[in-house]
Amino acid sequence: MADEKRLEDLRSKIMESIGKSEKDVVPIENKRFNTDNAVIDTHFKRQKSDGELPKAPKSRNVSHSNNRGPSSIITMSTNRTTYEQTRAGPHRQSYRDASGRSYNRENRYSSHNTGPQWNNNPYNRQRDERRGRNERFDRRGRNGNGNYDRFNYQRKNEGSKFNGDRDKRQLQTNKYDMNYNSQNVMYPGSSFDSPAYYNMASSKANSRLVISGLSQSSDPSIVARLKDLLENFISGLQKTESNAEDFKISNFYIGEGRPDHIIVEFSSQICSTMVLACRSFFNAKLGTFDLKWRRPNDYVQQLDHLVDFCRGTVIALENLENIGEGEDYRMKELFSSLNVTNGTAKPLFYKCSSNTNNTGKESEFTKCILLSFEVVTQDILDKLKPYKWFKPNDGKISQVTSWITFQSLPNLVTQSVRVESRVLLLLNCLDPLDLKDETFITEIKETLKYSIAGADTIKICQPGVDYRLNFENLASGAGNIYIKFKTLEAAKHAMEELPGTQFNDRTVLCTYIDEDDFDMMEATQLS
């Protein structure tokens, strides 16, 4: 009986506990025990976890899988990543997304883009892949040129396929003004950069001559006669000299405030050198010996080994009275005594015009000869003592053009090679195409006048009507700003403050300009 009571008590407790559990169940949850299949299926789909559903990968590093188990997805992703790394190697770890595009996992984010940097290379070769390949042309050469052996080979042997004949390329520039370095090449292993080297060597100051002493002549037509002599001489050079088709007088004017000074600008430096070498001949033709011929003060002597007669070691012989017209044997004796070959000696002749040609000869020997030496030694100077000579390309300022590179510019601009003056030249301040607007020019001048202390005169070089942004118009100096200060101290202070500052969103570069040259030449040509 006692056992039966215990069983009854236990059964009653179980029934009470079952009743309490049924009261605590939420009514919607009772649908789980409903026999309606629709309700059971709907709730069953709602209760499934995300890991059991087929889905796209949460990140691009997880591959797509149809397995519903999360463990299988991780296993498949790990296996595929391991396979790609094994296939690509240590340097070719590129990956693909679901669309088949490849990307680099290490460099897929940047500061500008929040997404990966896609590479639509049709061959699907990434930069890291190419670096990992031991290609024949990627190896470092014997001379340490890195990966450029292939391109040096192409430049030397296949240059004509891409740039045409070399002579045709050089016809675009003047061969006489082409500068060479000590290795007799414009750039090591390349002739493609010859136009760039020519543009760095060309200069207006190197093509100008200043003729003074006109006021001492009693002939009122001396200026017109001088211009006719120069034009006839240049026309004769065009017929006798090779590559002289572009020889001409670019500008001929009287200096501002200097009525006894004439400035003659030629198209090239070699043309100005030949004219300067014949100064004694022109003085004799004009019937006066008071004219003085010289280079501008801003003339820069090129220390490089220049082609033909543009180097600083050129010597001009003048007033050779012992060598007459047609006496070639005397000229050969002179050359042999100086150890000069025919290629480095140039006798200069003047083409006679029809009005002044009384002898019937087409040309007249000027009694002037240009001699080109590699180095002017003391032995050569001793042999030149019996003759009257001078150096037409000699100047106070000199430079080595082959040293001008982007890497050497920071050091070159800090060198003090020019004499301090009251005139500063500001470079890289303006876009030449913006200077066709007169209102903009006025605003620039007013801004400079009130922002730079001690400025007296401001001149801006404006472009011509047909100006274009190309190398042909580089020598015109469009966009350059000339500022003349009231005192030398103000110019020095501006030279210390202006270089490196920002003007018109550009970095300002400054240099001194000779004051006499500015007043005589630039002031009349600028606005």
UniProtKB/Swiss-Prot annotation:
Residues 424-511 form the RRM domain. Present with 4170 molecules/cell in log phase SD medium. It comes from the Eukaryota. The modification Phosphoserine is found at residue 49. MSL5, MUD2 and PRP40 interact to form the commitment complex 2 (CC2), a precursor of mature spliceosomes. One of its GO terms (molecular function) is pre-mRNA 3'-splice site binding. The keyword Chaperone does not apply. Residues 60-85, 110-122 have a biased composition (Polar residues). One of its GO terms (biological process) is spliceosomal complex assembly. Splicing factor that contacts pre-mRNA directly and is a component of the pre-mRNA-U1 snRNP complex (commitment complex 2) that forms during early spliceosome assembly in yeast extracts. Keywords: mRNA processing, mRNA splicing, Phosphoprotein, RNA-binding. The keyword RNA-binding applies. This is Splicing factor MUD2. Residues 42-55, 94-109, 125-141, 155-169 have a biased composition (Basic and acidic residues). The lineage of its organism: Eukaryota, Fungi, Dikarya, Ascomycota, Saccharomycotina. PANTHER family: RNA-BINDING PROTEIN. GO terms for cellular component: commitment complex; nuclear speck; nucleus; U2-type prespliceosome; U2AF complex. Residues 36-169 are annotated as: Disordered.
